[in-house]
């Protein structure tokens, strides 16, 4: 089956002042030749004078073949197919928005192309027709090319009726919903941070337990926090959530509470690993580490209460 392709948006060419994602294909005396990734890889050029606001000493430090770049459109000749681009005129904020738009548009593209493959489309025109009857309908409806379709597809995960007004037959609708669910259903992520908490004063382990319990009080119903002892004075904090950003925020908040509470008792608090999303491999390694330490400490009394602390509601 031939590889199908189509531009991401309804318009075949970008407009002047649009910030677009390109891939650098080659570098010549006049500038860099690039492919506009959102427009089915049509060619554009970044003139050397538009690479940087500073004096150019080494082109390779500014732009490299094979790398993706966010650039702004400064001229379009639709008749001749010429597109002039600038890298130096793109602000950091514009680049971030461009990357976000590209990521979401690419997700929509991946969904629709897979739908086309499942339905055994053989021509690019068939994929374009699917775009016209789905993604571009939402882009036009919400006046947000790239975002309209992504937001609508995301909504369709919980409310498939969003797709009711589209010109789709039963097979197309079924396959589209299956692929939207497969790609856009939220996946729970585990977030982890490693900390050191100790108190060598009179209150000792009681001060540590009190500080950790204070951190656990930052738990919510949707984001319960767990704290496990790795080896004194090191602990691992974890939470599982559908919202990555909120999960990171909750762990950071809990760490701040623990730090404040233990330092009130003249204890010590150090961050060994900032909160981050962990993979299955990380989790497997942590489980092995905890199992090994549990065996080593099996005959040691007095630490049972500190080995694992979970958010609980006091009776």
Curated annotation (Swiss-Prot):
It comes from the Eukaryota. One of its GO terms (cellular component) is eukaryotic translation initiation factor 2 complex. Residues 292-315 are annotated as: Disordered. Residues 17-88 form the S1 motif domain. SMART domains: S1. One of its GO terms (molecular function) is RNA binding. Residues 299-308 have a biased composition (Acidic residues). Keywords: Cytoplasm, Initiation factor, Phosphoprotein, Protein biosynthesis, RNA-binding, Translation regulation. GO terms for biological process: cellular response to amino acid starvation; cellular response to UV; negative regulation of translational initiation in response to stress; PERK-mediated unfolded protein response; response to endoplasmic reticulum stress. The modification Phosphoserine is found at residues 49, 52. Activity is regulated by phosphorylation at Ser-49 and Ser-52, which stabilizes the eIF-2/GDP/eIF2B complex and prevents the eIF2B-mediated exchange of GDP for GTP, thereby preventing the formation of the 43S pre-initiation complex (PIC). This results in the global attenuation of 5' cap-dependent protein synthesis and concomitant translation of ISR-specific mRNAs that contain a short upstream open reading frame (uORF) in their 5' UTR. It is found in: Cytoplasm, Stress granule; Cytoplasm, Cytosol. Phosphorylation at Ser-49 and Ser-52 stabilizes the eIF-2/GDP/eIF2B complex and prevents GDP/GTP exchange reaction, thus impairing the recycling of eIF-2 between successive rounds of initiation and leading to global inhibition of translation, while concomitantly initiating the preferential translation of integrated stress response (ISR)-specific mRNAs. Eukaryotic translation initiation factor 2 eIF2 is a heterotrimeric complex composed of an alpha, a beta and a gamma subunit. Belongs to the eIF-2-alpha family. Functions in the early steps of protein synthesis by forming a ternary complex with GTP and initiator tRNA. This complex binds to a 40S ribosomal subunit, followed by mRNA binding to form a 43S pre-initiation complex. Junction of the 60S ribosomal subunit to form the 80S initiation complex is preceded by hydrolysis of the GTP bound to eIF-2 and release of an eIF-2-GDP binary complex. In order for eIF-2 to recycle and catalyze another round of initiation, the GDP bound to eIF-2 must exchange with GTP by way of a reaction catalyzed by eIF2B. This is Eukaryotic translation initiation factor 2 subunit 1.
